[in-house]
Amino acid sequence: MVTQPAAFQPGDLVWLEFADVSGREQAGRRPAVVVSAGGYNARSSLILVCPVTSSGKPWPFKVKLAGETGGVDGYALVDQVRAIDPNARHARKAGEVSGACLADIRARLAVVLGLPPEA
């Protein structure tokens, strides 16, 4: 079990490098929203993130980021959630999304994963 010195929290907006991608996956240095639980992040060498795109094309699994996102404007791609190593990808915190934005991301992620909605 690995303990990260400063674990990322759900809703953190981080900049990182998306490499080794194929097809329609997002690539390059870009922001992403952390969706994994803080306790998991503190004990694992991985975090789960949704990459962010600037493209506003309509899609039910895109969530518009709120204004308090550290100056990042865009959409979280909920259907492209992935596990990444924040150290290997040089992740840096840039800000946080609002509680309402994180709740919207989690609700759409539950649909993608076939999980029951939160009560």
Question: Language-model segments: which ranges?
Answer:
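Conserved functional hotspots at enzyme active or ligand-binding sites that engage polyanionic ligands
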Residues: 1-119
